[in-house]
């Protein structure tokens, strides 16, 4: 009986590295699909034809629907992939740069994230229950990433203590959503000024949130 099972398994699984190559190909297609969806949504809105996304990704229409039966499934996946990319960049930057520079570069990455998120805004703010878990996902991934960079910069004495990661995310988002926030050059310049403000008087703590409105 065992021999038969083994033979059947050998028939189903290609030899050598073929299964691994198949997994790599599948992952590559998924990355291409999500990137294509992001670009199409940014250009044409979240109601853009799925066929347009498939053509840009170089996959069949059936592939899109097999992975994402509903349009909302695709939108959620695109949003989460952008959040993950932004969050994962924190550890990479922390290795490559000194603490203050790593924090500054990550904040510019967050500016890029907000820019890409704009193409999904109509769906994310529609009130559809399909997107209700996304704010929690955003906070779960991005707040710890920023907090680690921020705490490291504070410990190194290059950023003022007393700054909350959540406040910093909101500050950057506010700058990006201002009258000229949609202009990448403007948003980057404003965030660079914000970073300079964090560095100024690095040994002077900022009042914690509970004391700010007394």
Please tell me what each predicted stretch does.
Residues 72-74, 119:
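A secondary-structure capping/hinge motif
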Residues 1-56, 73:
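Basic, helix-initiating cap at the start of DNA-binding domains
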Residues 45-46, 66, 160:
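Helix-turn-helix/winged-helix DNA-binding modules
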Residues 1-17, 112, 144, 148-159, ...:
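C-terminal peripheral helix-coil segments that are non-catalytic and often amphipathic
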Residues 75-82:
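Alpha-helical DNA-contacting segments of helix-turn-helix folds
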Residues 123-131, 208-211:
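Short linear capping/connector segments at secondary-structure termini
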Residues 58-68:
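Short hydrophobic/aromatic patch on the recognition helix
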Residues 77, 88-116, 131-134:
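Hydrophobic alpha-helical connector segments
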